[in-house]
Amino acid sequence: VHPWDLKALDKLIVMSAAYRQSARVDSQQDPENRLVARGPRFRLSAETLRDQMLFLSGLLVEQQGGPSVRPYMPEGVWDETSRYGDLRGYKADMGSGLYRRSLYTIWKRTAAPPNMTLFDAPNREVCTVKRSRTNTPLQALSLLNETTAVEASRKLAERILRDGGTTDRQRLAWGFRLVTARLPAETELQLLETGLQQDLQSFTAAPEEAQKLLTVGATPAAKDLPAQQLAAWTLTANVPVDSSG
């Protein structure tokens, strides 16, 4: 049907009914999935997870081709393995280089991007036929604190506040569906609503903490939204992003 058109073949596969099965587990219907009654349940790969965060936030730069880029990385990440030249003193790009697809991230095998290796990206020292897939507390902490995750959550929060509706529940449901491609259950909505109110109270009592959170990342925070409100929604927007990873 699609001779040598791999992109068309991939699209055909991912849009098929078999590929788009629900991953919800049913204790009564094929609980062990021996009959393939549901889709597999696993987190996104390292590159896809980062790209999804950038896309949802509106930060993703979809330019194709060009040289490698240098997104955010911990300070001094290259210094321990290089003592001279361009491979010492890692410095992140400014502007669009921070938001290109992970495919274009510069890769140093002796000091690979920590946020990639943390989510089981191959180290590129040898060929990898099949990636390992782990779920660790450190991965969740990374999605809560890493610069790209926090900045993307803030921009996603701005998007939710502007486009998600007029009430908190409307916005929470809209943002949840945007990230997970499904509507939240009532219990999930209640948990998000409770967390939002707690965060809002905390930032109202400590506005300096709200300002500190909004300075994470190179993209400035929206000036037309109250700082405490935006900070609270930043943490709330991070929840479905974290859970989807």
Task: Please provide the spans of the model-predicted regions.
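Amphipathic alpha-helical segments within well-ordered protein domains
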Residues: 1, 141, 157, 173-180
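Short, basic alpha-helical nucleic acid-contact segments in DNA-binding proteins
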Residues: 1-3, 19-20, 199
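Loop/turn elements at helix/coil->beta-strand transitions in domains of secreted/extracellular proteins
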Residues: 2-11
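Short, solvent-exposed turn/loop segments enriched in Gly/Ser/Thr/Pro and often Arg
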Residues: 12-16, 25-26
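C-terminal structured "cap/appendage" subdomains that terminate the fold
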Residues: 164-234
